[in-house]
């Protein structure tokens, strides 16, 4: 009996360890205080050691990022719980990985110290909004190609690293579109290592040219609504 109980406790401990290792961001968003974060605004948790001035600055930049995304999409339909770290150790603890800003579906935004800026946060918030509008199940089934998702995020964030300056009547292409753009997120990451930043610029260019031909930014939420209803990207996207 005691031996069975010991085995059960061991299995339970291993299971909990696996959950904390693999699903740490999900655990962190469910219990931010368990990871040393505290609430600083509605839906926003920061590392407890973050000074008051730094908290206020982070909140201001987050608000600007939300406004940037809302302006593009015609309003925000999804408000993720946001976890902001002041130290790399905190970001590692909540499962942030190697990114500066990360997200889980449409319900969580993870921000590293170097990710506290408008461009990076609005880029990731675009992913949150896009995934939420299409639906997580549809996203898991590959409803939106990775290049489109990333290209939209670059345009939403107005990232000068990958975009040409805004000019009236002109596109934002800093690099031309490329053939065989990656569709699967894993392929995107693999090609990113090969092509580098050019991949982001090309994806943004391809999306921008499509938007110009289809009425501007409102074409994106209109497309996403149809994808959520079950239509396919290939049937809707006309270069």
Can you name each region flagged by the protein language model?
Residues 53-104, 114:
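Auxiliary, metal-adjacent structural segments of Zn-dependent hydrolase domains
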Residues 6-25:
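Hydrophobic membrane-insertion alpha-helices, especially the h-region
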Residues 105-122, 136-145:
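Short pre-active-site segment immediately N-terminal to the catalytic Zn-binding motif
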Residues 1-3:
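N-terminal Lys/Arg-rich, disordered targeting/topogenic segments
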């Amino acid at each position: 009996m005691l031996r069975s109980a010991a085995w059960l406790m061991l299995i339970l401990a291993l299971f909990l360890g696996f959950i904390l290792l693999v699903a740490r961001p999900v655990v962190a968003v469910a219990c931010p205080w368990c990871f040393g974060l505290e609430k600083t605004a509605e839906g926003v948790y920061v590392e407890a050691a973050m000074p008051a001035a730094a908290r206020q600055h982070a909140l201001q930049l987050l608000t600007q990022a939300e406004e940037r995304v809302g302006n593009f999409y015609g309003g925000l339909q999804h408000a993720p719980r946001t976890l902001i770290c002041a130290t790399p150790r905190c970001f590692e603890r909540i499962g942030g990985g190697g990114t500066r800003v990360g997200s889980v579906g449409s319900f969580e935004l993870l921000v590293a110290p170097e990710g506290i800026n408008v461009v990076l946060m609005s880029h990731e918030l675009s992913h949150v909004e896009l995934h939420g509008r299409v639906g997580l199940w549809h996203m898991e089934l590959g409803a939106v190609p990775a290049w489109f998702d990333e290209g939209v995020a670059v345009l939403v964030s107005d990232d000068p690293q990958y975009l040409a300056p805004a000019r009236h009547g002109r596109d934002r292409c800093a690099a031309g579109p490329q053939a065989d753009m990656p569709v699967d997120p894993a392929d995107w990451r693999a090609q990113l290592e090969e092509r580098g930043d050019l991949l982001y610029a090309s994806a943004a260019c391809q999306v921008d040219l499509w938007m110009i031909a289809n009425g501007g930014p409102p074409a994106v939420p209109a497309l996403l609504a149809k994808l959520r209803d079950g239509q396919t990207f290939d049937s809707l996207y006309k270069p």
